[in-house]
């Protein structure tokens, strides 16, 4: 697991290689990543946007930006958490992801929360970038 805290918001990520959805002979490798976002602070916040950088084993970077996560813009009161699972395919047997969430406090202050860098590893990769 990978975890990072920004302004009392903890983001924990657990990647998982999906062998049944992957087709190594066709250079298609698929991962799920399970995310937990916890508000360890004293103020209510809302997740508004996401930004991911997905890098494959050859150094090619794909940027992903959009509103919310899995169709939601969750509000997290102090002590609350939100969990979701998403996925990503790569043309290489390994890679890594890193990113951020755009958050806003109940008083309207916007800030970025870091998503920790995490490895996407499969049993088909010889070298691992992370």
UniProtKB/Swiss-Prot annotation:
InterPro entries registered for this protein in UniProt: ApaG_domain (IPR007474), ApaG_sf (IPR036767), Uncharacterised_ApaG (IPR023065)
One BP term from GO: error-free translesion synthesis
Domain (ApaG) ranges: 3-127
Annotated transmembrane regions: none
Matching Pfam families: DUF525 (PF04379)
Protein name: Protein ApaG
Lineage: Bacteria, Pseudomonadati, Pseudomonadota, Alphaproteobacteria, Rhodospirillales
Gene: apaG
């Amino acid at each position: 697991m990978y975890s990072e805290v920004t302004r009392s918001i903890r983001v924990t990520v657990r990647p998982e290689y999906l062998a049944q959805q992957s087709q190594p002979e066709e250079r298609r490798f698929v991962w799920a990543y399970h995310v937990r976002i916890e508000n360890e602070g004293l103020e209510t916040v809302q997740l508004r946007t996401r930004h991911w950088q997905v890098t494959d084993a050859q150094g090619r970077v794909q940027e992903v930006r959009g509103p919310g996560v899995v169709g939601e813009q969750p509000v997290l009161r102090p002590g609350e958490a939100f969990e979701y699972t998403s996925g990503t395919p790569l043309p290489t047997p390994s890679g890594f992801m890193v990113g951020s969430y755009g958050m806003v406090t109940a008083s309207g202050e916007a800030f970025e929360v870091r998503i920790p860098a995490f490895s996407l590893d499969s049993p088909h990769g010889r070298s691992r970038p992370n």
